Protein backbone atom coordinates (compact mmCIF):
# COMPACT_ATOMS: atom_id res chain seq x y z
CA UNK A 1 0.00 0.00 0.00
CA UNK A 2 1.52 3.38 -0.97
CA UNK A 3 1.98 6.16 1.57
CA UNK A 4 -0.70 8.43 0.12
CA UNK A 5 -3.32 5.68 0.16
CA UNK A 6 -2.31 4.72 3.72
CA UNK A 7 -2.75 8.33 4.90
CA UNK A 8 -6.14 8.68 3.22
CA UNK A 9 -7.34 5.33 4.59
CA UNK A 10 -6.00 6.19 8.04
CA UNK A 11 -7.82 9.52 7.97
CA UNK A 12 -11.02 7.80 6.87
CA UNK A 13 -10.74 5.22 9.67
CA UNK A 14 -10.01 7.94 12.22
CA UNK A 15 -13.04 9.86 10.99
CA UNK A 16 -15.19 6.75 11.20
CA UNK A 17 -13.95 6.08 14.74
CA UNK A 18 -14.71 9.65 15.77
CA UNK A 19 -18.15 9.36 14.20
CA UNK A 20 -18.78 6.08 15.99
CA UNK A 21 -17.88 7.60 19.33
CA UNK A 22 -19.86 10.74 18.58
CA UNK A 23 -23.16 8.96 17.92
CA UNK A 24 -23.65 7.66 21.48
CA UNK A 25 -22.38 10.98 22.82
CA UNK A 26 -24.99 12.87 20.82
CA UNK A 27 -27.63 10.39 21.95
CA UNK A 28 -26.46 10.99 25.53
CA UNK A 29 -26.96 14.72 25.11
CA UNK A 30 -30.61 14.39 24.05
CA UNK A 31 -33.54 14.40 26.46
CA UNK A 32 -34.07 11.59 28.96
CA UNK A 33 -37.53 10.11 28.43
CA UNK A 34 -39.62 9.24 31.49
CA UNK A 35 -42.67 6.99 31.09
CA UNK A 36 -45.98 7.76 32.82
CA UNK A 37 -48.26 4.70 32.87
CA UNK A 38 -51.52 5.67 34.59
CA UNK A 39 -55.19 5.16 33.66
CA UNK A 40 -56.71 8.40 32.38
CA UNK A 41 -60.05 6.74 31.58
CA UNK A 42 -62.13 3.88 32.96
CA UNK A 43 -62.88 2.91 36.56
CA UNK A 44 -59.41 3.81 37.92
CA UNK A 45 -59.20 7.28 36.34
CA UNK A 46 -60.70 8.75 39.56
CA UNK A 47 -57.45 7.80 41.31
CA UNK A 48 -54.77 7.64 38.61
CA UNK A 49 -55.20 10.86 36.61
CA UNK A 50 -53.77 12.87 39.49
CA UNK A 51 -50.66 10.68 39.52
CA UNK A 52 -50.03 11.49 35.87
CA UNK A 53 -50.35 15.19 36.68
CA UNK A 54 -48.00 15.09 39.67
CA UNK A 55 -45.35 13.38 37.53
CA UNK A 56 -45.66 16.15 34.95
CA UNK A 57 -45.20 18.71 37.72
CA UNK A 58 -42.14 16.94 39.15
CA UNK A 59 -40.53 16.62 35.71
CA UNK A 60 -41.21 20.29 34.96
CA UNK A 61 -39.65 21.27 38.30
CA UNK A 62 -36.57 19.09 37.69
CA UNK A 63 -36.10 20.61 34.24
CA UNK A 64 -36.05 24.08 35.83
CA UNK A 65 -33.11 22.83 37.91
CA UNK A 66 -31.27 21.76 34.75
CA UNK A 67 -32.69 18.28 34.33
CA UNK A 68 -30.60 15.21 35.17
CA UNK A 69 -26.95 14.76 34.16
CA UNK A 70 -27.28 18.04 32.29
CA UNK A 71 -30.08 16.64 30.12
CA UNK A 72 -33.73 17.69 30.04
CA UNK A 73 -36.41 15.19 31.03
CA UNK A 74 -39.18 14.45 28.53
CA UNK A 75 -42.41 12.90 29.88
CA UNK A 76 -44.10 10.26 27.72
CA UNK A 77 -47.75 9.83 28.77
CA UNK A 78 -49.90 6.85 27.74
CA UNK A 79 -53.42 5.83 28.78
CA UNK A 80 -53.87 2.13 29.63
CA UNK A 81 -57.54 2.97 30.28
CA UNK A 82 -58.10 0.72 33.34
CA UNK A 83 -57.63 -2.22 30.95
CA UNK A 84 -55.20 -4.67 32.52
CA UNK A 85 -53.83 -6.35 29.33
CA UNK A 86 -53.50 -2.88 27.77
CA UNK A 87 -51.12 -1.93 30.59
CA UNK A 88 -48.65 -4.52 29.27
CA UNK A 89 -49.00 -3.23 25.70
CA UNK A 90 -48.47 0.37 26.79
CA UNK A 91 -45.48 -0.62 28.96
CA UNK A 92 -43.88 -2.31 25.94
CA UNK A 93 -44.57 0.80 23.86
CA UNK A 94 -42.89 3.02 26.45
CA UNK A 95 -39.79 0.83 26.79
CA UNK A 96 -39.25 -0.61 23.30
CA UNK A 97 -40.55 2.23 21.12
CA UNK A 98 -40.14 5.37 23.23
CA UNK A 99 -36.94 4.15 24.97
CA UNK A 100 -37.89 5.58 28.36
CA UNK A 101 -35.22 5.44 31.08
CA UNK A 102 -37.77 4.59 33.78
CA UNK A 103 -41.54 4.39 34.17
CA UNK A 104 -43.72 5.68 36.98
CA UNK A 105 -47.08 3.97 36.95
CA UNK A 106 -49.84 1.49 37.79
CA UNK A 107 -52.31 1.57 40.68
CA UNK A 108 -53.98 -1.82 40.97
CA UNK A 109 -51.90 -4.92 41.59
CA UNK A 110 -53.48 -6.61 38.58
CA UNK A 111 -52.06 -3.83 36.39
CA UNK A 112 -48.65 -4.20 38.05
CA UNK A 113 -48.73 -7.98 37.58
CA UNK A 114 -49.68 -7.40 33.93
CA UNK A 115 -46.58 -5.28 33.22
CA UNK A 116 -44.03 -7.25 35.29
CA UNK A 117 -43.05 -9.67 32.49
CA UNK A 118 -42.49 -6.72 30.13
CA UNK A 119 -40.19 -4.87 32.55
CA UNK A 120 -38.23 -8.07 33.20
CA UNK A 121 -37.95 -9.03 29.52
CA UNK A 122 -36.88 -5.56 28.39
CA UNK A 123 -34.89 -4.84 31.58
CA UNK A 124 -36.44 -1.50 32.49
CA UNK A 125 -37.40 0.16 35.79
CA UNK A 126 -40.90 0.64 37.25
CA UNK A 127 -41.68 2.85 40.25
CA UNK A 128 -44.95 1.62 41.75
CA UNK A 129 -46.55 4.22 44.09
CA UNK A 130 -49.54 2.51 45.69
CA UNK A 131 -50.12 0.34 48.74
CA UNK A 132 -50.26 -3.32 47.79
CA UNK A 133 -50.47 -6.88 49.11
CA UNK A 134 -46.74 -7.63 49.36
CA UNK A 135 -45.54 -11.16 48.53
CA UNK A 136 -43.27 -9.75 45.84
CA UNK A 137 -39.80 -8.30 45.40
CA UNK A 138 -38.80 -7.88 41.77
CA UNK A 139 -35.42 -6.63 40.57
CA UNK A 140 -36.99 -4.23 38.05
CA UNK A 141 -39.60 -2.75 40.42
CA UNK A 142 -39.26 -0.22 43.25
CA UNK A 143 -42.28 -0.25 45.56
CA UNK A 144 -42.77 3.26 46.95
CA UNK A 145 -46.28 2.56 48.29
CA UNK A 146 -47.01 0.65 51.51
CA UNK A 147 -46.51 -3.05 52.09
CA UNK A 148 -49.10 -4.71 54.40
CA UNK A 149 -46.94 -4.11 57.50
CA UNK A 150 -46.97 -0.38 56.66
CA UNK A 151 -50.76 0.00 56.35
CA UNK A 152 -53.06 -3.01 56.79
CA UNK A 153 -51.54 -4.57 59.92
CA UNK A 154 -51.16 -1.24 61.82
CA UNK A 155 -54.78 -0.34 60.92
CA UNK A 156 -56.11 -3.59 62.36
CA UNK A 157 -53.97 -3.15 65.48
CA UNK A 158 -55.40 0.36 65.92
CA UNK A 159 -59.01 -0.84 65.60
CA UNK A 160 -58.46 -3.70 68.05
CA UNK A 161 -56.67 -1.58 70.65
CA UNK A 162 -58.33 1.83 70.38
CA UNK A 163 -61.82 0.96 69.08
CA UNK A 164 -62.04 -2.41 70.91
CA UNK A 165 -63.18 -4.12 67.69
CA UNK A 166 -63.98 -7.85 68.03
CA UNK A 167 -65.82 -8.63 64.76
CA UNK A 168 -64.27 -7.93 61.37
CA UNK A 169 -65.69 -7.40 57.89
CA UNK A 170 -62.97 -7.68 55.25
CA UNK A 171 -64.56 -6.07 52.17
CA UNK A 172 -62.66 -5.74 48.93
CA UNK A 173 -62.73 -5.48 45.17
CA UNK A 174 -62.28 -8.88 43.54
CA UNK A 175 -58.64 -8.98 42.46
CA UNK A 176 -55.21 -9.89 43.77
CA UNK A 177 -54.54 -6.99 46.18
CA UNK A 178 -57.68 -7.33 48.33
CA UNK A 179 -57.62 -11.15 48.22
CA UNK A 180 -53.99 -11.42 49.32
CA UNK A 181 -54.28 -8.60 51.87
CA UNK A 182 -57.37 -10.22 53.38
CA UNK A 183 -55.62 -13.60 53.46
CA UNK A 184 -52.83 -11.93 55.47
CA UNK A 185 -55.30 -10.10 57.74
CA UNK A 186 -57.41 -13.22 58.35
CA UNK A 187 -54.29 -15.19 59.37
CA UNK A 188 -53.19 -12.29 61.57
CA UNK A 189 -56.59 -11.99 63.30
CA UNK A 190 -56.90 -15.75 63.85
CA UNK A 191 -53.40 -15.79 65.37
CA UNK A 192 -54.56 -12.99 67.71
CA UNK A 193 -57.39 -15.21 68.95
CA UNK A 194 -60.28 -13.87 66.85
CA UNK A 195 -62.84 -16.63 66.16
CA UNK A 196 -63.40 -17.59 62.51
CA UNK A 197 -67.14 -16.80 62.84
CA UNK A 198 -66.18 -13.25 63.82
CA UNK A 199 -64.62 -12.63 60.39
CA UNK A 200 -66.81 -11.91 57.34
CA UNK A 201 -65.09 -11.67 53.95
CA UNK A 202 -66.76 -10.18 50.87
CA UNK A 203 -65.63 -9.34 47.33
CA UNK A 204 -67.27 -7.25 44.61
CA UNK A 205 -66.25 -6.50 41.00
CA UNK A 206 -64.59 -3.28 39.85
CA UNK A 207 -67.12 -0.47 39.43
CA UNK A 208 -69.70 -2.19 41.66
CA UNK A 209 -72.67 0.10 42.33
CA UNK A 210 -75.47 -1.88 44.04
CA UNK A 211 -74.42 -2.13 47.68
CA UNK A 212 -77.84 -2.53 49.31
CA UNK A 213 -77.62 -6.26 50.06
CA UNK A 214 -73.96 -6.21 51.10
CA UNK A 215 -74.39 -3.25 53.46
CA UNK A 216 -77.48 -4.94 54.90
CA UNK A 217 -75.34 -8.05 55.56
CA UNK A 218 -72.68 -5.88 57.23
CA UNK A 219 -75.35 -4.25 59.42
CA UNK A 220 -76.69 -7.67 60.44
CA UNK A 221 -73.17 -8.99 61.13
CA UNK A 222 -72.53 -5.97 63.35
CA UNK A 223 -75.67 -6.49 65.44
CA UNK A 224 -74.36 -9.50 67.37
CA UNK A 225 -73.37 -7.47 70.43
CA UNK A 226 -69.66 -7.24 69.61
CA UNK A 227 -67.95 -4.09 68.32
CA UNK A 228 -67.63 -4.50 64.54
CA UNK A 229 -65.49 -2.72 61.94
CA UNK A 230 -65.09 -2.89 58.17
CA UNK A 231 -61.58 -3.14 56.75
CA UNK A 232 -62.01 -1.92 53.18
CA UNK A 233 -59.84 -2.77 50.20
CA UNK A 234 -62.56 -1.53 47.83
CA UNK A 235 -60.86 0.25 44.94
CA UNK A 236 -61.79 2.94 42.45
CA UNK A 237 -65.17 4.58 41.88
CA UNK A 238 -67.09 1.78 43.68
CA UNK A 239 -66.25 3.56 46.95
CA UNK A 240 -68.73 6.38 46.29
CA UNK A 241 -71.93 4.24 46.25
CA UNK A 242 -70.55 2.05 49.08
CA UNK A 243 -70.29 4.93 51.55
CA UNK A 244 -73.55 6.40 50.28
CA UNK A 245 -75.34 3.13 51.05
CA UNK A 246 -73.83 3.05 54.55
CA UNK A 247 -75.46 6.45 55.09
CA UNK A 248 -78.74 5.31 53.53
CA UNK A 249 -78.94 2.43 56.01
CA UNK A 250 -78.07 4.65 58.96
CA UNK A 251 -74.67 3.11 59.69
CA UNK A 252 -72.52 5.73 61.41
CA UNK A 253 -68.80 5.58 62.11
CA UNK A 254 -69.62 5.32 65.82
CA UNK A 255 -71.63 2.14 65.09
CA UNK A 256 -69.45 0.30 62.55
CA UNK A 257 -66.29 2.20 61.64
CA UNK A 258 -64.79 1.63 58.20
CA UNK A 259 -61.03 1.85 57.76
CA UNK A 260 -60.13 2.18 54.08
CA UNK A 261 -56.83 1.55 52.33
CA UNK A 262 -57.79 3.07 48.97
CA UNK A 263 -59.81 6.15 49.94
CA UNK A 264 -57.86 9.37 50.17
CA UNK A 265 -58.27 13.07 49.54
CA UNK A 266 -58.64 12.65 45.76
CA UNK A 267 -61.47 10.11 46.07
CA UNK A 268 -63.29 12.39 48.56
CA UNK A 269 -62.99 15.52 46.43
CA UNK A 270 -66.26 16.59 44.88
CA UNK A 271 -68.51 14.04 46.60
CA UNK A 272 -70.92 14.39 49.50
CA UNK A 273 -68.76 13.56 52.53
CA UNK A 274 -71.64 13.44 55.06
CA UNK A 275 -71.89 9.61 55.03
CA UNK A 276 -68.13 9.32 55.48
CA UNK A 277 -67.49 11.65 58.42
CA UNK A 278 -65.81 9.80 61.29
CA UNK A 279 -64.77 6.82 59.18
CA UNK A 280 -61.07 6.11 58.90
CA UNK A 281 -58.29 5.64 56.39
CA UNK A 282 -54.78 4.29 56.85
CA UNK A 283 -52.04 5.89 54.78
CA UNK A 284 -48.42 7.01 54.97
CA UNK A 285 -49.32 10.63 54.14
CA UNK A 286 -52.22 13.01 54.61
CA UNK A 287 -52.60 16.50 53.12
CA UNK A 288 -53.61 17.83 56.55
CA UNK A 289 -50.21 17.07 58.13
CA UNK A 290 -48.47 20.37 58.83
CA UNK A 291 -44.79 20.54 57.85
CA UNK A 292 -42.90 23.18 55.84
CA UNK A 293 -42.22 20.61 53.09
CA UNK A 294 -45.89 19.60 52.85
CA UNK A 295 -47.11 23.21 52.91
CA UNK A 296 -44.74 24.04 50.03
CA UNK A 297 -45.82 20.94 48.08
CA UNK A 298 -49.54 21.74 48.47
CA UNK A 299 -48.93 25.32 47.35
CA UNK A 300 -46.92 24.13 44.34
CA UNK A 301 -49.61 21.58 43.41
CA UNK A 302 -52.47 24.10 43.57
CA UNK A 303 -50.47 26.51 41.40
CA UNK A 304 -49.63 23.78 38.89
CA UNK A 305 -53.30 22.74 38.66
CA UNK A 306 -54.45 26.39 38.68
CA UNK A 307 -57.03 25.25 41.20
CA UNK A 308 -57.16 26.31 44.86
CA UNK A 309 -59.35 23.28 45.62
CA UNK A 310 -56.84 20.75 44.24
CA UNK A 311 -55.96 18.11 46.84
CA UNK A 312 -52.90 15.99 47.51
CA UNK A 313 -52.74 12.36 48.62
CA UNK A 314 -50.53 9.43 49.60
CA UNK A 315 -49.69 7.92 46.17
CA UNK A 316 -48.73 11.42 44.99
CA UNK A 317 -46.21 11.64 47.82
CA UNK A 318 -44.94 8.16 46.88
CA UNK A 319 -44.20 9.52 43.38
CA UNK A 320 -42.49 12.57 44.92
CA UNK A 321 -40.20 10.27 46.93
CA UNK A 322 -39.68 7.73 44.14
CA UNK A 323 -38.86 10.41 41.58
CA UNK A 324 -36.37 12.07 43.94
CA UNK A 325 -34.73 8.69 44.56
CA UNK A 326 -34.52 7.96 40.82
CA UNK A 327 -32.89 11.35 40.13
CA UNK A 328 -30.33 10.74 42.89
CA UNK A 329 -29.62 7.20 41.66
CA UNK A 330 -29.10 8.35 38.05
CA UNK A 331 -26.74 11.07 39.25
CA UNK A 332 -24.91 8.58 41.49
CA UNK A 333 -24.58 6.07 38.63
CA UNK A 334 -23.67 8.79 36.13
CA UNK A 335 -25.95 7.15 33.58
CA UNK A 336 -29.57 6.09 32.95
CA UNK A 337 -28.40 2.51 32.24
CA UNK A 338 -31.04 0.42 34.06
CA UNK A 339 -28.60 -2.10 35.58
CA UNK A 340 -26.44 0.64 37.08
CA UNK A 341 -29.46 2.64 38.32
CA UNK A 342 -31.01 -0.50 39.88
CA UNK A 343 -27.74 -1.16 41.72
CA UNK A 344 -27.50 2.49 42.83
CA UNK A 345 -31.02 2.77 44.30
CA UNK A 346 -30.79 0.71 47.53
CA UNK A 347 -29.55 3.01 50.29
CA UNK A 348 -30.69 6.18 48.51
CA UNK A 349 -32.62 8.53 50.81
CA UNK A 350 -35.21 11.18 50.01
CA UNK A 351 -37.20 13.45 52.34
CA UNK A 352 -40.87 12.63 52.68
CA UNK A 353 -43.45 15.39 53.05
CA UNK A 354 -44.39 14.65 56.67
CA UNK A 355 -41.05 15.40 58.29
CA UNK A 356 -38.94 12.25 57.93
CA UNK A 357 -36.48 10.80 55.44
CA UNK A 358 -37.41 7.66 53.51
CA UNK A 359 -34.75 5.15 52.50
CA UNK A 360 -34.81 2.59 49.68
CA UNK A 361 -34.09 -0.85 51.12
CA UNK A 362 -32.35 -3.89 49.57
CA UNK A 363 -35.80 -5.49 49.06
CA UNK A 364 -36.78 -2.50 46.84
CA UNK A 365 -39.32 -1.28 49.42
CA UNK A 366 -38.84 1.86 51.48
CA UNK A 367 -39.15 3.11 55.04
CA UNK A 368 -42.41 4.97 55.73
CA UNK A 369 -44.39 6.47 58.62
CA UNK A 370 -47.93 5.13 59.16
CA UNK A 371 -50.92 7.35 59.96
CA UNK A 372 -54.57 6.63 60.76
CA UNK A 373 -56.82 9.53 59.75
CA UNK A 374 -60.47 10.28 60.52
CA UNK A 375 -62.51 11.72 57.65
CA UNK A 376 -63.79 15.27 58.23
CA UNK A 377 -66.74 16.95 56.52
CA UNK A 378 -64.39 18.96 54.27
CA UNK A 379 -62.89 15.78 52.79
CA UNK A 380 -59.65 16.11 54.76
CA UNK A 381 -58.35 13.90 57.58
CA UNK A 382 -57.66 14.37 61.28
CA UNK A 383 -54.67 12.21 62.21
CA UNK A 384 -55.75 10.15 65.23
CA UNK A 385 -52.75 7.81 65.40
CA UNK A 386 -49.23 7.51 63.98
CA UNK A 387 -46.14 5.36 64.35
CA UNK A 388 -43.27 6.78 66.40
CA UNK A 389 -40.76 6.44 63.59
CA UNK A 390 -40.50 5.06 60.07
CA UNK A 391 -41.46 1.44 59.38
CA UNK A 392 -39.32 -0.61 56.95
CA UNK A 393 -41.46 -2.25 54.26
CA UNK A 394 -41.58 -6.06 54.38
CA UNK A 395 -41.81 -7.68 50.95
CA UNK A 396 -42.99 -10.96 52.49
CA UNK A 397 -45.59 -11.35 55.25
CA UNK A 398 -44.68 -13.09 58.48
CA UNK A 399 -48.36 -14.04 58.83
CA UNK A 400 -48.32 -16.53 55.93
CA UNK A 401 -46.66 -19.94 56.22
CA UNK A 402 -45.20 -19.85 52.72
CA UNK A 403 -43.71 -16.39 53.23
CA UNK A 404 -42.53 -16.06 56.82
CA UNK A 405 -39.00 -17.33 56.08
CA UNK A 406 -38.53 -15.27 52.91
CA UNK A 407 -36.78 -11.95 52.39
CA UNK A 408 -36.04 -9.81 49.36
CA UNK A 409 -32.41 -8.75 49.09
CA UNK A 410 -31.10 -7.45 45.78
CA UNK A 411 -27.82 -6.18 47.28
CA UNK A 412 -26.21 -9.15 49.06
CA UNK A 413 -28.31 -12.12 47.93
CA UNK A 414 -29.34 -10.81 44.47
CA UNK A 415 -32.70 -12.47 45.10
CA UNK A 416 -36.28 -11.37 45.68
CA UNK A 417 -37.42 -14.48 47.57
CA UNK A 418 -34.42 -15.73 49.58
CA UNK A 419 -35.25 -18.37 52.20
CA UNK A 420 -33.29 -17.55 55.36
CA UNK A 421 -33.76 -21.11 56.72
CA UNK A 422 -32.59 -23.05 53.67
CA UNK A 423 -30.23 -20.31 52.44
CA UNK A 424 -31.65 -20.74 48.95
CA UNK A 425 -33.06 -18.32 46.41
CA UNK A 426 -36.45 -19.21 45.01
CA UNK A 427 -38.28 -19.65 48.29
CA UNK A 428 -37.78 -23.41 48.42
What are the residue ranges of the model-derived segments?
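C-terminal segment of classical bacterial N-terminal signal peptides
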Residues: 17-25
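N-terminal secretory signal peptides and thylakoid transit peptides that target proteins
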Residues: 1-14
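Beta-alpha junction/loop-to-helix N-cap segments that form part of ligand/metal-binding clefts
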Residues: 46-53, 65-135, 144, 203-212
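Solvent-exposed, acidic/polar segments of extracytosolic/periplasmic ligand-binding ectodomains
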Residues: 349-428
Amino acid sequence: MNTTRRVVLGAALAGATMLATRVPASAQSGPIKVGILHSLSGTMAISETTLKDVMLMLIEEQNKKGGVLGRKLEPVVVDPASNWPLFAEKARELIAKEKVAATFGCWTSVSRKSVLPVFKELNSILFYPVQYEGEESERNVFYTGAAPNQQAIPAVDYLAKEEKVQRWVLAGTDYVYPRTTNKILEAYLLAKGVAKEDILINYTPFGHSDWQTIVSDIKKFGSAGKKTAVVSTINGDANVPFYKELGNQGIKATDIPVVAFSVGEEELAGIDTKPLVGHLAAWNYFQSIKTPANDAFIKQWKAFKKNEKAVTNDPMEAHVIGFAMWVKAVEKAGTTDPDKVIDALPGIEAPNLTGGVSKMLPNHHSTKPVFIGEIKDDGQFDVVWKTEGLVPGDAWSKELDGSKDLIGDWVEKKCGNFNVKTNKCGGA
